[in-house]
Amino acid sequence: MLVIPAIDLIGGEVVRLEKGDFAKKTVYARDPAEKAAELVRDGATLIHVVDLDGAKAGWPVNLDAVRAICAVPGAEVELGGGLRSLPDIEKVLELGVRYVVLGTAAVERLDLVRQACARFPGRVRSGIDARNGEVKIAGWLEGTGLGAAEVARRVKEAGVGLVEYTDVGRDGMFTGVDADGAARLQAEAGVQVVASGGVASLDDVRACRAAGLAGVIVGKALYEGRIALADAVRTAAE
């Protein structure tokens, strides 16, 4: 199972939000590339980058920071946030991004997901973010009335092989990851699932591994010193 550290970007800086609230922002690093290099040294092989400004705007905003992260040797990069057109997807892949994570597009533009999967096979993933069972889009700011399993089935049919599932209500709160919910989603939709949101300790890594998930994304727990990435990587491989 893969442990995937997260880098969230606002204004070119590494930040974390509490429950996805842009008003509750903590800046953890001014230099995203330096932070990425540190994560690679600690064992990261894939880094989950989210352009939070892009998620709100509807197009990629932090491209300079993304380019700098991609230039760090030793880890692949997946990017989400504001990727809602084929030219923008192509642009970030040309910057060196390995995988794109489509969230809002997975709900509003299933045709785009199909086109992207056909044009860039194996490089398109879907981010499904839910609060109280309802999928949220546009940087978690808008409800959809849809359930996670329904969206996961749709993107699977469009060609997506892996879904990253975030419980927005747990994100940044250290309440424990929803490994059981992610495992249910994996079984119901028949697609690989990476869990995210609420990771607080190595027990969460163990729970995701025991649930048979493809991976777990770790963010604030790393930045607040609750988990050492090297320990998490070791635990996932046990």
Swiss-Prot record:
GO terms for biological process: L-histidine biosynthetic process; L-tryptophan biosynthetic process. One of its GO terms (cellular component) is cytoplasm. Its main location: cytoplasm. Its EC number is 5.3.1.16. GO terms for molecular function: 1-(5-phosphoribosyl)-5-[(5-phosphoribosylamino)methylideneamino]imidazole-4-carboxamide isomerase activity. It is found in: Cytoplasm. InterPro entries: Aldolase_TIM, His_biosynth, HisA_bact_arch, Isoase_HisA-like, Isoase_HisA-like_bact, RibuloseP-bd_barrel. It catalyses: 1-(5-phospho-beta-D-ribosyl)-5-[(5-phospho-beta-D-ribosylamino)methylideneamino]imidazole-4-carboxamide = 5-[(5-phospho-1-deoxy-D-ribulos-1-ylimino)methylamino]-1-(5-phospho-beta-D-ribosyl)imidazole-4-carboxamide. Keywords: Amino-acid biosynthesis, Cytoplasm, Histidine biosynthesis, Isomerase. The active site is at D8, D129. Pfam families: His_biosynth (PF00977). Pathway: Amino-acid biosynthesis; L-histidine biosynthesis; L-histidine from 5-phospho-alpha-D-ribose 1-diphosphate: step 4/9. Belongs to the HisA/HisF family. NCBIfam families: 1-(5-phosphoribosyl)-5-[(5-phosphoribosylamino)methylideneamino]imidazole-4-carboxamide isomerase (TIGR00007). HAMAP family: HisA. This is 1-(5-phosphoribosyl)-5-[(5-phosphoribosylamino)methylideneamino] imidazole-4-carboxamide isomerase. It comes from Anaeromyxobacter dehalogenans (strain 2CP-C).
